[in-house]
Curated annotation (Swiss-Prot):
GO biological process: dopamine catabolic process; norepinephrine biosynthetic process; octopamine biosynthetic process
Pfam families with a match to the protein in the record: Cu2_monoox_C, Cu2_monooxygen, DOMON
Naturally occurring in which organism (per UniProt): Drosophila melanogaster (Fruit fly)
Secretion signal span: 1-20
This protein's name: MOXD1 homolog 1
Length: 698
């Protein structure tokens, strides 16, 4: 037997231990049902395998009465284990804990630490105040298990307050117990995993659910050429032969190749309504099933019938593990639904210009054992269009997408829909995203908030408490972006260098609606920048190009071309996006002071460096008019679009932080030990100043 065979056996045994531990430590989740029928999950427990081999398992749950979070770590070592919480995945400024069971005494140890302030400043530093309480610890010949807890907010400037945001959870495994005074984090294995600590997670437990079947849907030999920066590929598939209605209970990604090198950015599986257009040939669908697929959203290559593939049933984005639904909900398939065909859409992002061949897709888990409710997925947010504009050089700039009464009053049932979960989606510039909820002129608690959004880690936000959205309510997807190092405006679009602002909402009961979007009306978008007319194109033509993806050449035979200076340097992929932009083809005729400029050139000359100007533009887009769209499953656009103003409402105010000390966690001068005096002195000084101001006012 070779050394490789022995290593493989060892790894297999370790992974089997980990999976067995996972299966045996899943606590049945209790729940309450309120007067509105919403489910509130309680006593939930999360269990995550932190590495790919099952060497490190992290289990946790929240005790709301104590305002505490409990952890249990099971690690394949008799040495130390490290755990840390970070906003960006770096050791610097991370909130960390080192733990071990003493080999000599059997005593469990948990040490509260923090990362150095600079990446090159050495090992972790011990906190002055220890805020982690060890509860239990033991080890055998191979494994160490430690249980401990901490407050969600500790009021220690060197700890990070935990929240519903996406955290980068650091982990490390060491072969030996730490030597006194040596807090070196660099163990034999270490890594980072993005987690949402406040979200329960549902799983497919093979011991308790019978009759689960799987349906694998993948593309076949899709070639991503070196020259392709962005590719959207669509493939039609047919539903398997089923005996009546079934319920999809969850789905997982099937990714070809090593994950780190994979170019798949996101995937969506859509239902198709095969009889939606008059003149459609039903036999064409079976021909498309046998084909390899084609480029999506192409006027030349994509069949018009594929526009009917609009209702999502599975959504995956970079960093996600997929989703399993709670036990009372399932997405229907087969039976009387009339849906026989589905479309798999895959977005390939290839910034490094590598050639690859892909076979990715979904594994759908379904069962004939129907659940209580039919569930669905709908998309809400900003309609993907170049009328979404993010100026360059911005630390924080917001865009909003509105789903208003034109959809909710018409499509939602009397008792509303109940939101189970949501996946927030933007591209590289996205920094924070929230799904806001407005009813009767008052903003309610946000449904989902992620103030540490990372487009590389787009996990499902599973709600511990389902949210009821009633007819007449507003859903607002609110995104903020950072473009500090960009020199030109960023627009809405399909490339990761362009932007999106979307929420994929999983809910029940299922309704015949696939999407609810808004955008700045086209005419108002141009008038915002004092542009009123283009050569040989009236504004109606321009609106049609934006709203219906019409080809510019259909309207531009007499259009005047602007004189653009040739690019003498190397053309980047961003340059290509700008050159192909519709905004770069529209040449201004009115007003005269801007004539013969392309609209894109006009935007590049605006004073984006002026914060007052940029803030006015941001507020004008947010609080101005919005064109809303309600996409209904049974028709391509059966509810007319509507132009509305941003709703007036009393905004939700986030409760103040319990601890002022957290305001100083990013201070470059903050140090352990003597720095506590500096922190306390500064807080006291601020308090005295505030009291002095109050006295003056009195």
């Amino acid at each position: 037997m070779s050394v490789q065979d022995v290593l493989w056996i060892v790894l297999t045994v370790q992974l089997s231990f980990g999976l067995a531990y996972f299966e045996n430590n899943q606590r049945t989740q209790d729940y309450d049902v309120d007067k509105n029928g919403s489910v509130h999950h309680k006593n939930w427990v999360r269990n995550e395998m932190m590495d790919s081999l099952g060497l490190y398992w992290l289990k946790w749950w929240i005790n709301a009465n104590e305002n505490s979070i409990y952890f249990e770590v099971t690690v394949h070592t008799r040495g130390f284990a490290g755990l840390g919480f970070s906003k960006d995945g770096r050791l610097a400024r991370a909130d960390m804990v080192l733990m071990w069971v003493d080999d000599a005494t059997g005593h469990p140890n948990v040490l509260d630490c923090h990362g150095a302030l600079h990446p090159s400043s050495g090992p972790p530093l011990q906190d002055d105040t220890q805020n982690y309480d060890v509860l239990d610890g033991k080890q055998n010949g191979t494994h160490t298990i430690l249980k401990f807890k901490r407050k969600i907010e500790t009021c220690d400037p060197f700890d990070i307050p935990l929240s519903a945001d996406t955290f980068k959870v650091l982990w490390s495994i060491g072969e030996n117990d730490p030597i006194h005074g040596n807090l070196d984090w660099q163990g034999q294995s270490r890594g980072v995993k993005a987690l949402q600590l406040f979200s329960p997670m549902f799983t497919k437990n093979s011991h308790s659910i019978e009759g689960i079947q799987k349906w694998d849907i993948t593309v076949n030999n899709v070639t991503i050429d070196r020259s392709m920066d962005t590719l959207y590929w669509c493939k039609i598939v047919r539903l398997p032969e089923l005996t009546g209605k079934q319920h999809i209970i969850g789905y997982e990604p099937l990714l070809s190749g090593k994950y780190e090198r994979n170019v798949v950015h996101h995937m969506t599986l859509f239902e198709c309504q095969s009889k939606i257009y008059s003149g459609s040939d039903p036999s064409s669908w079976d021909l498309w099933v046998r084909s390899a697929g084609t480029v999506c959203n192409s006027n030349l290559l994509t069949p018009r019938d594929w526009d009917s593939c609009s209702t999502p049933v599975a959504v995956w984005s970079l960093g996600s593990d997929g989703q399993f639904l709670p036990p009372h909900a399932g997405i229907p398939m087969g039976g009387a639904s009339g849906v026989s065909y589905y479309m798999l859409e895959i977005h390939y992002d290839n910034p490094d210009g590598k050639e690859s061949v892909d076979h990715s897709g979904f594994r759908i888990h379904y069962t004939p054992n129907l659940r209580t409710y039919d569930s669905g997925i709908l998309i809400s947010g900003v309609s993907i269009s170049e009328t979404q504009l993010i100026p360059p050089g911005q630390k924080k700039y917001r865009s909003v997408g509105i789903c208003g009464p034109s959809c909710s009053s018409v499509m939602f049932p009397k008792d509303g829909i109940k939101i189970i979960s949501g996946t927030l989606h933007s591209h590289q510039a996205g920094r924070t995203i929230s799904l806001r909820h407005v009813r009767s002129g008052k903003e309610l608690n946000p449904i989902i908030v992620d103030e540490n959004y990372d487009y590389r880690h787009q996990k499902v936000h599973q709600l511990a408490n389902e949210t009821v959205v009633l007819p007449g309510d507003y859903l607002i997807t609110d995104c903020s972006y950072e473009t500090k190092y960009r020199k030109r405006p960023t627009f809405g679009g399909y490339s990761t260098k362009e932007e999106m602002c979307l929420t994929f909402i999983t809910y029940y009961p299922k309704i015949e609606m696939s999407g609810c979007y808004s955008m700045t009306p086209v005419r108002e978008f141009f008038e915002m920048f004092r542009v009123y007319q283009f050569y040989s194109l009236n504004m109606t033509d321009v609106e049609n190009m934006f709203l219906y993806n019409s080809d510019y050449t259909d309207y531009s035979k007499q259009a005047k071309n602007a004189t653009n200076k040739p690019n003498s340097g190397k053309t980047s992929k961003e340059d290509v996006i700008y050159q192909e932009s519709l905004l770069n083809k529209l040449v201004i005729s009115d007003p005269a002071e801007f004539h013969d400029r392309t609209f894109l050139s006009h935007l590049n000359q605006l004073p984006w460096h002026d914060p007052l100007f940029t803030k006015r533009v941001e507020q004008a887009f947010i609080t101005g008019t919005h064109m809303t769209f309600c996409r209904v499953s049974k028709d391509s656009l059966s509810i007319p679009s509507e132009i509305i103003r941003y709703p007036e409402f009393t905004a939700y105010v986030k409760p103040p932080a319990a601890c002022l000390n957290y305001l100083f966690t990013d201070n470059e001068e903050l140090r352990s030990g003597s720095s506590q005096f500096f922190t306390d002195f500064t807080l006291s000084l601020l308090l005295l100043i505030q009291l002095g101001l109050q006295t003056t006012l009195l």
